[in-house]
Amino acid sequence: MVNEYKAHSSFILKVVITLIGYWIASILAIIIYSMFFKIETNTFLLCLLLPTPIIWFNILIGMGLTYRCMENLTIYDKHKLWCVFVRDLTLTILATILATLTTMELYQIEHPLKPIEFVFIVGLVLIVGFTIITTLIIKYLKIIKNLKKISKN
């Protein structure tokens, strides 16, 4: 038998992960594009700010629906769903960072920056990405620890 609330929560969380991944990818793409191809500041800010409220509004609606569905689940099922959410979010962000680095390499071939600038930008992307991924992995491990405690009880 399928738990209807668990299925709804799982699906909505996957949609939220997709929206977060799209938002991060679009922000990184705009920033990287503006570094290699000089664009006006107004255009840059418009590209950054235009999709953000729309995407985050949808993310908030999705999280609200998830919270509503999760009210009917057991504590174990809630932790299990959050565990899957954090795991999938980590993989999505990792894939986005790797795709960004690949894009930067291709842009560097076509429209080269100074080597020191390029190395600095790549280092910055790696440091920020490593920090976010590490934070998510720590959160994942905490959720796993809580799952073990709950399953023992």
UniProtKB/Swiss-Prot annotation:
The keyword Cell membrane applies. InterPro entries: DUF5418. Its main location: membrane. GO terms for cellular component: plasma membrane. It is found in: Cell membrane. It is a multi-pass membrane protein. Keywords: Cell membrane, Membrane, Transmembrane, Transmembrane helix. The chain crosses the membrane at residues 17-37, 44-64, 118-138. To M.jannaschii MJ0129 and MJ0554. This is Uncharacterized protein MJ0587. It comes from Methanocaldococcus jannaschii (strain ATCC 43067 / DSM 2661 / JAL-1 / JCM 10045 / NBRC 100440).
